[in-house]
């Protein structure tokens, strides 16, 4: 029997506000343990939460970006559970009235087709702290993350393969990043994914029993974990067994999913309205204000890059996959840089450098200004493409102006015939054997002089001018 795969994803995104959702403490990542905490995060008796308006702003933007309806009358709820990283023994979240509902996002699949994936809801909530289990037998709790604002985006069970789940996450990450509400860095925990997967016989409308997957720390592992579950569940069903509703984690080392616990249901959390936060209303004016702050999204940028700038669909997709790269490209083109040349550099030398250094574009000294200046001095013949690669590395590490560096470093290309012709004559004088081979008609003997000339000029001879002059002087040499 063949089975249809049914997948839904729950994505937690940390919102990039300066302070936490219910306390004035910093929400920034990377500080010392428990440095970003106060009495609200510690749940001291008598302290009360105060809602951060910036979190609601971000929630509205997310809902608009994901084509969602917005609940204009909102409240928060308590989700009750005990764990050491949750000192209140409950989490403030949204249960029956999330900020956004009934949305969708269009994704592009590997075969070039598109599919619309429904989004059931997006709700605001606070993050929990972090437990670390030491080798000394003690467990340690860091509450820096406690109270960091989250939006949980819950898809419909519309995905029918791990490939579609991967495409959905890629599209969702782009939209959230462009909306400016999160950096969506999985390595820092600002984007976390749980997957729900079940199988059912083709033609059956009722969903099968689902399994939840956790510990999916990359899009690649989401795909691998889902692929493993498809095989595991299919084998159980074909052998006459039944799937249990359970939570499993993906073990990257063994490339398998491992049982964590039997899955709880919503009733286990005993949700009830949060009494310390009153009901509040989101006005139409507030929604429209947030709408005006939304930028052009990846899909629209890609279309513009193709229609207005003449880029290929592939180049447009690569450039818009990351907002930082796309914004860099936008500024470089606005400064007069040739769109195709800027695109080639960003996808070629710049991407290779970032991969080798393990850095992002924001972490190096390259700017749209000095990249455009470098492209300009390539085009006007000041430097060759070969020398430009060395210039780029300097700019990426040290910044500054491209032309100024080239002139100070003595890298300016030699294009003046009055300088090159005497050097060519000296090359002839220094390589008498090669001259003799050329005059005797030895095959490809002329090719050697190109290398001799570039060596004599330390690679600074303008290749086009130098080859033309070399051919001219070799012709004269043959006549004599």
UniProtKB/Swiss-Prot annotation:
InterPro entries: Asn/Gln-tRNA_amidoTrfase_suB/E, Asn/Gln-tRNA_Trfase_suB/E_cat, Asn/Gln_amidotransferase, Asn/Gln_tRNA_amidoTrase-B-like, GatB, GatB_C_1, GatB_Yqey_C_2, Gln-tRNA_amidoTrfase_suB_CS
Keywords associated with the record: ATP-binding, Ligase, Nucleotide-binding, Protein biosynthesis
Swiss-Prot/TrEMBL GO biological process terms: glutaminyl-tRNAGln biosynthesis via transamidation; translation
Disulfide bonds listed in the record: none
GO molecular function: asparaginyl-tRNA synthase (glutamine-hydrolyzing) activity; ATP binding; glutaminyl-tRNA synthase (glutamine-hydrolyzing) activity
Keyword Ligase in record: yes
Catalytic activity: L-glutamyl-tRNA(Gln) + L-glutamine + ATP + H2O = L-glutaminyl-tRNA(Gln) + L-glutamate + ADP + phosphate + H(+); L-aspartyl-tRNA(Asn) + L-glutamine + ATP + H2O = L-asparaginyl-tRNA(Asn) + L-glutamate + ADP + phosphate + 2 H(+)
Family from the record: Belongs to the GatB/GatE family. GatB subfamily.
Name of the protein described by the UniProt record: Aspartyl/glutamyl-tRNA(Asn/Gln) amidotransferase subunit B
